[in-house]
Amino acid sequence: MKIDVHHHFYPQAFREALEAAGGDPSGWYIPPWTLELDQEINATLNVTTTILSVTAPGPVIAKDPAAAASLARECNRSAAAIRDAAPAQYGFFASVPSLFDTALALEEIRYALDELHADGVTLFTRYGQGANYLGHEAFAPIWAELSRRQAVVFIHPTHPQDTALINRALPQPMFDYPHETGRTAMDLLTSGRLRQHRGCRVILSHAGGTLPYLIHRAATMLPCMPPDRNIGLSRDEILDTAREVFYFDTAISANEVTLSALARFAKPGHILFGSDFPNAPRDAIVRFTRFVEEEAAALPDGVTVEALKENALQLFPRLKRAEANGVPKI
């Protein structure tokens, strides 16, 4: 049995906003989603609890700040209603408007965590028109509040600045998204944002994207840089911070090469199951999940289904209490 921490849903308001904007800027399609389809895939994957989230580009598809805040509120209320109807089977990560709209974002974090009792908060890898990744100084108040609350933060990639496709066969989520996750993770590490605000537990989508593969490259070179580019941390300090703060989901990443590298890099207890339903093709989701079930345990640093579930229970006290007591908790 599994707890799925990377699992999307499409409230009607979000679907309508995407359609009004001409679709996802990344080039990905808008998949069908209903609660019935959701429950069917959960049964197929042996998922007992699903943490819902709104995928990229999220509420910022509405360009007006007030409209984006209203869309985030509608998405969060929709998620809470699903959770309230089946609290042992569902939870959710809250949506927020653009982090540049600090007051609006902080208010939605407060509302979602205090009044709706969300299990965490979704942030996207980049906001605005420029290279504004999550270590940007404008986002420091957001990180300070999330750290104060010791929140679980689910980081999901969104489209890069350049939305031009390599070709029609490669919409950006297919290959570019993992690079965006690696970029924002390294920005958080090199900006000092994570060391300043240590209270957050941060889930990186898709096995951390390119971070586990490339972090040693950057961490080894950074201490050798000239003073104006030297962040004052040793290689081991950079690696230790990443291992301490970051968790990683397996969504669309469960294969021998990727999971072997991730298991060697991640701190024990920091790998979680994720499906990426409904955005990934169903057959691909099933194939990746079967690898987790049937082959991952045999890897050199084996990853078992039981361990993935226990890791999630440790991260989400509500679910751990429900498991211990045998009753749903909100």
From Swiss-Prot:
An annotated GO cellular component of this protein is: cytosol
What InterPro entries does the database record attribute to this sequence? ACMSD, Amidohydro-rel, Metal_Hydrolase
Q: In which pathway does it act?
A: Secondary metabolite biosynthesis
- Out of the domains of life, which is the source? Eukaryota
* One GO-annotated biological process of the protein: secondary metabolic process
List localization entries: Cytoplasm, Cytosol
EC number(s) given by UniProt: 4.1.1.52
Q: Which UniProt keywords apply?
A: Cytoplasm, Decarboxylase, Hydrolase, Lyase, Metal-binding, Zinc
Name the predominant localization: cytoplasm
**Residues the record lists as binding Zn(2+):** H6, H8, H156, D276
Catalytic activity as recorded in UniProt: 6-methylsalicylate + H(+) = 3-methylphenol + CO2
Enumerate the GO terms in the molecular function aspect: 6-methylsalicylate decarboxylase activity; hydrolase activity; metal ion binding
* Pfam families reported for this sequence: Amidohydro_2
| Assembly and interaction partners | Monomer.
Q: What does this protein do?
A: 6-methylsalicylic acid decarboxylase; part of the gene cluster that mediates the biosynthesis of aculins. The pathway begins with the synthesis of 6-methylsalicylic acid by the polyketide synthase (PKS) acuA via condensation of acetate and malonate units. The 6-methylsalicylic acid decarboxylase acuB then catalyzes the decarboxylation of 6-methylsalicylic acid to yield m-cresol (also known as 3-methylphenol). These first reactions occur in the cytosol.
Q: Which family does it belong to?
A: Belongs to the metallo-dependent hydrolases superfamily. ACMSD family.
Q: What is this protein called?
A: 6-methylsalicylic acid decarboxylase acuB
**Source organism per UniProt:** Aspergillus aculeatus (strain ATCC 16872 / CBS 172.66 / WB 5094)
Q: What is the lineage of its organism?
A: Eukaryota, Fungi, Dikarya, Ascomycota, Pezizomycotina
